[in-house]
Amino acid sequence: MNHIEKENLDSLFLYHGNVLGAARTTSMALNSLINAFDQLDCEQEEIFARYEELATAIKATRPRITPLSHMLEQFEEEMKPFWSKDLDKLRAQAKKILKNKVKLYKSRAERVVRHGIQFVEEGDGIIVHSASSMVTNVLLQAKQVMLKDFSVIVLQLDPVRTPQVALTLEEQEIPHIVIPAFNLCHYVEQANKILLGAVSVTRDLKVVAPVGTSTTLSLCRLNGIKSYLFANSFHFSHGLADAQRIYQADENIASSRSTYRLTTHSHDLVELDLIDTLIDEDGEVENERLWAFTG
């Protein structure tokens, strides 16, 4: 894979990560890999090299999609006895393992949601900065299953995801408003909670989250608004924050009077200390489990 192809792969994952979130991007990528094995058209001895080239590039995307990297690592370990098998057996085993990984990932996400709905209470005013699939499903299940009445403040993020979230809330008749994130200060008295998802949680206890999360969380903390982060354990990274490869872009901006260079980052790094409650597939993560994770 040449430099341009790697840049295109980065852009592809960055776009899907921003629009779909890390959870749905992980499932989509695994299903795409299943289709790729199904359509293999090469010599048997070429397969591992081709897979390894693609997997290496995926694991090096900016930012790193931690759950997808974990899934690929498990897949590679389970495939070790099968890379030398004939093409039909190799293909069948690869598809079987990958399908099981999709099921495993989805089952952990569903368990997070089951625990998460316990943190939505009657009369809550909930801020949603970037509605990950887990956050969206927590809200839906709290309404549909627990029959809770609450309202949502949706912070405008992008032209794709924000309308999707607003439509979902509208369809479920969940009271909500959509506002620019920079106007949140005018609405803090209407909220008591903020629900968040994450691309990853690092071993030095940083959260890789959508851009703007750190500013929003700081304002919430200043105003006594409790924060809840939902992330199944596949989002917990082996690495530290500086290994997460957050994408940095530099762009020359020209005006009528001057030209300046604008530097932006694709995601925020948030101190886990800013989060009041972390929920994974086993429920609320207590300090003992966090200490075990940090090693």
What are these regions (language model features)?
Residues 132-145, 217:
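Histidine-anchored nucleotide/phosphate-binding helix
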Residues 1-97:
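Long amphipathic alpha-helical segments
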Residues 144-146, 155-295:
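Conserved phosphate- and dinucleotide-binding cores of soluble alpha/beta proteins
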Residues 125-136, 159:
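Gly/Ser/Thr-rich loops at beta-strand to alpha-helix junctions
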Residues 56-84, 100-105, 109, 114, ...:
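Non-catalytic, soluble scaffold/interaction modules
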Residues 77-122, 150, 154-194:
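Ligand-binding beta-strand-loop-alpha-helix segment within the catalytic cores
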